[in-house]
Structure formats: structure tokens, C-alpha cells
Regions:
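Short linear motifs in intrinsically disordered
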Residues: 6-9, 59-63, 119-123
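Gly/Pro-enriched, hydrophobic low-complexity segments
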Residues: 65-161
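Short, conserved active-site entrance elements at the starts or edges of catalytic domains
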Residues: 35-71, 93-97
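Generic beta-strand structural signal
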Residues: 7, 14, 54, 68-70, ...
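N-terminal cleavable signal peptides for secretion/export
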Residues: 3, 161-164
Length: 164
């Protein structure tokens, strides 16, 4: 977030955590919050949704920007269902609607996220612009400047801060 601060989030099948300059200590993600983080990660990146969601159902067809798109309903565990629109020709995820359960507020926050500016990166379609909007924080825009493969990271970046 540049001069406004930073957030580090790591999620695996078994654990997850968030650390930021806003909170004095890291926050472990457990139960539904860990599942929710895994779902959000799967929607942001290209993953096999059938490995993440309990059900994925086509519920309709719509036209977006003169293109045919399938409307999907997805569920996992006890989380609220997610509605998504997928381009029928390219398979690009155009947008999704989900209620994000905030661990601090304890209430679901309806959120709509659009994915735009898809580009091919070594055979994988990647959205280089992601726009998320909700009533509490307004609109957040994520833009990818560069997408690289085979980047080496210090493995400690992915450990929970208390486990270093």
C-alpha cells in the first residue's frame, strides 16, 4: 500500500496468518477464516475450483460486454455461497460476489470483485487488474506491474511471525 502501510498474508492447507502495520501483532487464521482465505486465494489465482469448493453449479447465462458468460454458484463448508461470472469462450473469471466474514467485526461484508486486463503468462491467463468493492472500505484496486515465474524467496517469509 505504499506510504499507507503493508499487509503480509500466508495461507496453506493447514494454517494461515495475516500481519500488517495496522495491527500490533500477527493474527492467525483458523476455521472459517482460514477456509475463507483459501477461497479468496483460489478466486484470485488460477486454480482447480473443484479442489477448493464443495460444489460448483452453473445457475445461468448472462451477457457481459457483448460476451456470453456463465453464472456459477459455489459453496465451501459453512461459508456463504459465492456467485461468479465466467467468460464462456476464454474461461476468464469476470467477477465474483461473496460475503467476507471479518474476524474483527464478526459480520459478513458483501463484496464484489472484478477481474480485468487478462494477459497470457507462459500459457496461463492472469488478470493484471483486480477491483474489489464493499460498503465499509469502498473500492480497492490491485494492479500487477510484472508477473515472474521461478522467483526465489527466503522461506521464512511464509512462516507465521511468532514461529521465526
Amino acid at each position: 500500500f505504499g506510504r499507507f502501510g503493508w499487509i503480509h498474508q500466508a495461507v496453506s492447507k493447514d494454517q494461515g496468518w495475516i500481519n500488517s502495520n495496522i495491527q500490533p501483532s500477527s493474527q492467525r487464521l483458523e476455521e472459517k477464516y482460514l477456509t475463507q482465505a483459501m477461497v479468496a486465494h483460489a478466486l484470485l489465482l488460477t486454480e482447480d475450483w473443484l479442489q477448493i469448493f464443495d460444489t460448483v453449479t452453473v445457475t445461468g447465462i448472462e451477457t457481459r460486454d457483448d460476451r456470453k458468460a456463465y453464472i456459477l454458484q459455489m459453496r465451501v463448508g459453512e461459508l456463504p455461497s459465492i456467485t461468479a461470472s465466467v467468460d464462456a469462450e476464454t474461461g476468464d473469471l469476470l467477477y465474483y460476489k461473496m460475503s467476507v466474514i471479518d474476524p474483527n467485526l464478526g459480520i459478513p461484508i458483501p463484496t464484489v470483485t472484478r477481474k480485468e486486463d487478462y494477459r497470457d503468462v507462459e500459457g496461463v491467463r492472469v488478470a493484471f487488474r483486480i477491483v474489489s468493492r464493499n460498503e465499509f472500505s469502498g473500492e480497492t484496486i490491485f494492479e500487477i506491474d510484472k508477473f515472474e515465474n521461478d522467483v526465489k524467496f527466503d522461506g521464512r517469509l511464509f512462516y507465521p511471525p511468532n514461529d521465526k
